């Protein structure tokens, strides 16, 4: 028994010594800047590294949980290790704005730049969900259109019909937010607990618009030559305190999340994309006092069979016009646009389904569907893509050929892929003006939930275009070309 006890004690001593040595060896785990100490400076360096700033951390030391990767989980462990202090919370809420408080009443309310009065849509201005509050600065009127807007404290305008008075004489206090993230169901969801329903801005950055100083038919032109964003930035107005670091380590979209305190009573949450341009749409809404962002994942078709390359995808196909919305009409046949769009949309539906996609149609009969209802239907479907079918028409017959329009930056590549295939189909039959992919603020393309395009299949006011467009065989060729563009686009996604 004594010998056994001694053996146990000796073994315990060895284990204890081993544990002490292990602890000592692990003591420098977290020494990200390799200065021999683990402190807040290491936290700061790891934050910078995860925000893609030019720093060179010791990655072995930064791998706090030893899983072979450096991500948000390691940052959380390092913060806990060094007991990083939370920012000082205000003991009293300061009043940041007073006056007439407005409440957004329309879901997905479009916002406009506040430094101009024009009715100019811009993909750089995020929509605001119903329930958002802000102080009214003044009412403004666009002298060209006569439209009226509320200029809000966040610096953007909304149509007067999209907001109502919440308090005739109120105050907005400084806001506090905390954030969490989850990954499920094809989305990365970022949820912010907010003291009240603050306005916010969401931007994809960096992104340049080389023609924005040129005025088109609908104001500044937001055409993009390529989609270059490496991060999503959400800036929250009237916010002086932010806590929590969303864990995005399991997200296929984001590699890091960081907070930035700004000098104008705002905080910015920056989500770094894993790959440049790897962004596929988002949805945002208020759920009680929680602002919920749902960022769409890419539907991976790489393992699909050659005969069903679009399996797993959901695509909304919108047949433009309908009912009393007849659209343009043919110069020789007298056919209405609404008739041809429905014929082509049905053929496209059949083709996409044959390739494995689930297709949601905005209409299947000669009925009028309000544009707002098309957008709502699209959001509810949670699709991978949205395609609206239209016909062009002008006052002179020489204009010819198809055009594909987009609004959001991440829709441009889809427009280019579709128009390349559609134009090639035209060239088999007639020489056609190549009109390409262009930016345009068509209402249905402004949904943010997925890449969305509007295809003008050709000019019904051009006799040669019309002669092709009204034939069953060419409509089938167009449907096949659009579907080919979809497959090529989806395969090309980062």
Located regions from the model:
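Extracytoplasmic/secreted envelope proteins and their assembly/folding machinery
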Residues: 40-47, 72-75, 79, 342-345, ...
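Active-site-adjacent substrate-binding region
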Residues: 411-438
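Active-site-adjacent mobile loop/cap segments within catalytic or ligand-binding domains
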Residues: 385-395, 405, 433-494
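Short linear recognition/processing motifs and adjacent strand/loop elements at protein termini
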Residues: 87-313, 391
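Cellulosome-associated attachment modules in secreted, modular CAZymes
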Residues: 5-92
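Extracellular/periplasmic catalytic domains that process cell-envelope and extracellular macromolecules
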Residues: 128, 143-144, 308-310, 353-354, ...
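Active-site histidine-acidic residue metal-binding/catalytic motifs
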Residues: 294-377, 381-383
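A short, glycine/acidic-enriched catalytic loop
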Residues: 325-335, 393-420
